[in-house]
Amino acid sequence: MPRAGVCGCWGGQVLPLLLAYICYLLLGATIFQLLEKQAEAQSRDQFQLEKLRFLENYTCLDQQALEQFVQVILEAWVKGVNPKGNSTNPSNWDFGSSFFFAGTVVTTIGYGNLAPSTEAGQVFCVFYALMGIPLNVVFLNHLGTGLRAHLTTLDRWEDHPRHSQLLQVLGLALFLTLGTLVILIFPPMFFSHVEGWSFREGFYFAFITLSTIGFGDYVVGTDPSKHYIAVYRSLAAIWILLGLAWLAVVLSLGSLLLHRCSRLWQLIRGLDLKDGAAPDSEPRSQKIPISA
């Protein structure tokens, strides 16, 4: 019965997944509240105290004038202007910064620290995203497929069947290790050095960026007190694209690596039995295809 099939699907698959999803969200909300609410209250109290001290030191200002000034600062921040800077600071819309912004649009990262403020810019951003997001998905898919295709060379190691599984597992592990260093270790170290962050902050920025969460609390190339090279943010955009492609490969290879480790363990456990068998009756280890 079609109706019974739909009900069975909801009861057997969708409903448990929905409950797990809701529970996961509730768990995250509870932990974030416990970790962050007290710090937010302290920051709010500290800000109010600083405003009172400012009014005490500058008696020519009243509360209303200060609130208006704070509002101007907030509006400038929303439009991408850093209140700590001045008119001599580099533009947020030079080519390098614009290239970086375009990358955050098509990758759906959207840090939130910079957005079009003109009507024409907002309209263009909508149509640009409509075309750019699918293009980005197709590009990353093909780039990830190309990176993964290089691993198919492991299939040529067939001279020693007993070692083929080991070679394939080691090859995947080496690929994941080098990718982690190039994408998730070295770039945070570089960003930490340039931006004056700790490694924890640099790694946090890298993960939040490559996971396309993009909170906007840490963004490269936005400190007005630093002098960045012209291509700094453009290079960061290229790193984002390569990092997203690498993550796509990692997600697709993660289950494959676990499966091969399981096969390798079975192979090791069966070595004694295979050594006792006749040479011509020794089974060849079956290759697990890497490419889809």
From Swiss-Prot:
**Name of the protein this chain belongs to:** Potassium channel, subfamily K, member 16
User: In which compartments does the protein localize?
Assistant: Cell membrane; Endoplasmic reticulum membrane; Mitochondrion inner membrane
Q: Which residues lie on this side of the membrane: Cytoplasmic?
A: 1-13, 141-165, 259-292
Query: What's this protein's function?
Result: K(+) channel that conducts voltage-dependent outward rectifying currents upon membrane depolarization. Voltage sensing is coupled to K(+) electrochemical gradient in an 'ion flux gating' mode where outward but not inward ion flow opens the gate. Homo- and heterodimerizes to form functional channels with distinct regulatory and gating properties. In pancreatic islets, conducts K(+) countercurrents for Ca(2+) release from the endoplasmic reticulum (ER) and regulates the frequency and duration of cytosolic Ca(2+) oscillations coupled to secretion of pancreatic hormones.
Q: Which UniProt keywords apply?
A: Cell membrane, Disulfide bond, Endoplasmic reticulum, Ion channel, Ion transport, Membrane, Metal-binding, Mitochondrion, Mitochondrion inner membrane, Potassium, Potassium channel, Potassium transport, Transmembrane, Transmembrane helix, Transport
Q: Which gene encodes it?
A: Kcnk16
Residues bound to K(+) 1 are 108-109, 212-213
Entry binding sites for K(+) 2: 109-110, 213-214
Q: Which domain of life is it from?
A: Eukaryota
Origin organism lineage: Eukaryota, Metazoa, Chordata, Craniata, Vertebrata
Intramembrane annotation covers: 98-116, 202-221
Task: Tell me what induces its expression.
Answer: Down-regulated when pancreatic islets are exposed to a cytokine mixture of TNF, IL1B and IFNG.
Tissues in which the UniProt entry reports expression: Expressed in pacreatic beta-cells (at protein level). Expressed in pacreatic delta-cells (at protein level).
GO BP annotations listed? endoplasmic reticulum calcium ion homeostasis; membrane repolarization during action potential; potassium ion transport; regulation of glucagon secretion; regulation of insulin secretion involved in cellular response to glucose stimulus; regulation of release of sequestered calcium ion into cytosol; regulation of somatostatin secretion
The family annotation for this protein states: Belongs to the two pore domain potassium channel (TC 1.A.1.8) family.
Give the Gene Ontology MF terms in alphabetical order.
metal ion binding; potassium channel activity
